[in-house]
């Protein structure tokens, strides 16, 4: 086991109930990696609407509590299990939404930030299948926004075989739509996006939207 220096305890946020005030700042012992695991020092994390739904008990009301929320984060590898070959101490990585999704169907129990512990903590221990290296040109903050919304948008665009010149419609201005807008524009598509907010549509235009529709007008 290779370990960079880390504190014996860590700070984290823990969802202890679905009631108001259920998200509590606390401390735990800093985890050590088992076989097949890495420990990252979390540098950035982002919030998706799913995280809000989880905290309210609307996503999985039977979820076992307490748990550490948030699926999307990035950080530096500071410890690796003895059998880990693809990652080393010092690597910059981001989390992966489905921790066990390789060649087989992902299982719900591997969902980061829900059934599996999330990244709203100083340190996170994750299976080596649950992290990806991030390129040098990308900041931790940028990488922390990608695992859920951006990958969803990318998957949809790839599945639809979008090409330059195609017309692509995005409904709303949530995370998936905003990432989809930028990816589709990078591929040369003509992007149409909807919202009930003129302010949000102005932002969409700044990001490259060709046509905007306020569906309340």
Positions of PLM-derived features:
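Short, Lys/Arg-enriched N-terminal segments with co-localized hydrophobic residues
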Residues: 1-9
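Short glycine/threonine/proline-enriched tight-turn/helix- or strand-capping micro-motif at secondary-structure
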Residues: 20-29, 58
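Glycine-rich beta-strand-centered segment in the early N-terminal region that forms part
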Residues: 30-45, 58-100, 117, 135-138
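Cytochrome P450 core scaffold surrounding the K-helix E-X-X-R motif
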Residues: 50-55
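NAD(P)H dinucleotide-binding glycine-rich loop of Rossmann-like/cofactor-binding domains
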Residues: 96-171, 206
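Adenosine-nucleotide cofactor-binding segment
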Residues: 167-173, 185-217
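N-terminal Rossmann-fold NAD(P) dinucleotide-binding loop
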Residues: 177-178
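Conserved SAM-binding loop of SAM-dependent methyltransferases across substrates and taxa
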Residues: 182
């Amino acid at each position: 086991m290779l370990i960079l220096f880390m504190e014996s305890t860590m700070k984290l946020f823990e969802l202890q109930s679905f009631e108001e005030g259920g998200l509590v700042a606390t401390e735990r012992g800093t985890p050590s990696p088992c076989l097949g695991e890495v420990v990252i020092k979390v540098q950035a994390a982002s919030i998706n609407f799913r995280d809000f739904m989880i905290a309210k008990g609307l996503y999985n009301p039977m979820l076992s509590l307490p748990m550490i929320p948030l699926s999307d984060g990035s950080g530096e590898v500071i410890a690796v299990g003895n059998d880990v070959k693809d990652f080393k101490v010092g690597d910059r990585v981001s989390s992966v939404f489905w921790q066990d999704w390789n060649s087989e169907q992902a299982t719900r129990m591997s969902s980061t930030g829900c059934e599996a512990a999330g990244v709203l903590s100083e340190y996170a221990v994750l299976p080596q299948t649950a992290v990806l290296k991030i390129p040098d040109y990308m900041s931790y903050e940028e990488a922390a926004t990608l695992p859920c919304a951006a990958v969803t948008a990318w998957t949809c665009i790839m599945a639809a075989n979008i090409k330059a010149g195609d017309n692509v419609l995005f409904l709303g201005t949530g995370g998936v739509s905003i990432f989809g807008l930028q990816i589709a524009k990078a591929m040369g598509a003509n992007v149409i996006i909807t919202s009930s907010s003129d302010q949000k549509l102005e932002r969409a235009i700044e990001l490259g939207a060709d046509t905007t529709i306020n569906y309340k007008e």
